């Protein structure tokens, strides 16, 4: 989960190595980037960072990525009855890939990692459904990004895991 893929292009791989060294903390990759259904240059790269001081990591990221403080969005997530808080930043333009980094306090590390592990290996039938969705979205762009995301949430949260006591809110900052 905290390994940088060997098959990333050299620039992308170096970006994550440099970022990890600069932040002096582990990067936890999660989602399709850890599975065989990852599509290079199409699938997004999701990363979680756990820390005792979110603001310190955000400041370091701000300097590393040369972004303003309002680039970070606030996360409020009800996960298995626990309210989780954090921050997210998109770093697409720095990686030339769809990439998102989430920053959480170490207090939430155990529950978040437990949730992330559920998605690192998937049953065969879920893999087939994802293959169909990704083909319709990436290869034959029949599904819009919004529709693709909605169907993917249904596949994961209702068919695979059947999440009932979970909700996720992303509070967007005013980007001026």
Language model: regions and residue ranges:
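Catalytic core of pol beta-like nucleotidyltransferases
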Residues: 1-17, 22-23, 34-42, 51-176
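Glycine-rich beta-strand-to-loop/alpha-helix junction loops that act as flexible
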Residues: 30-32
């Amino acid at each position: 989960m905290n390994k940088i893929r060997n098959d990333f292009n050299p620039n992308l791989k170096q970006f994550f190595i440099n970022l990890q060294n600069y932040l002096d903390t582990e990067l936890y990759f999660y989602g399709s980037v850890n599975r065989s259904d990852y599509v290079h240059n199409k699938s997004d790269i999701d990363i979680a960072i756990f820390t005792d001081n979110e603001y310190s990591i955000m400041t370091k990221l701000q300097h590393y990525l040369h972004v303003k403080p309002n680039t970070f969005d606030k996360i409020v997530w009800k996960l298995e009855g626990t309210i989780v808080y954090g921050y997210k930043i998109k770093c697409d333009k720095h990686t030339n890939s769809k990439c998102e980094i989430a920053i959480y306090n170490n207090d939430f590390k155990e529950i978040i990692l437990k949730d992330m592990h559920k998605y690192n290996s998937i049953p065969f039938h879920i893999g087939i459904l994802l293959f169909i969705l990704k083909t319709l979205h990436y290869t034959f762009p029949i599904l819009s990004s919004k529709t693709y995301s909605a169907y993917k949430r249904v596949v994961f949260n209702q068919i695979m895991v059947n999440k009932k006591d979970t909700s996720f809110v992303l509070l967007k900052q005013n980007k001026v």
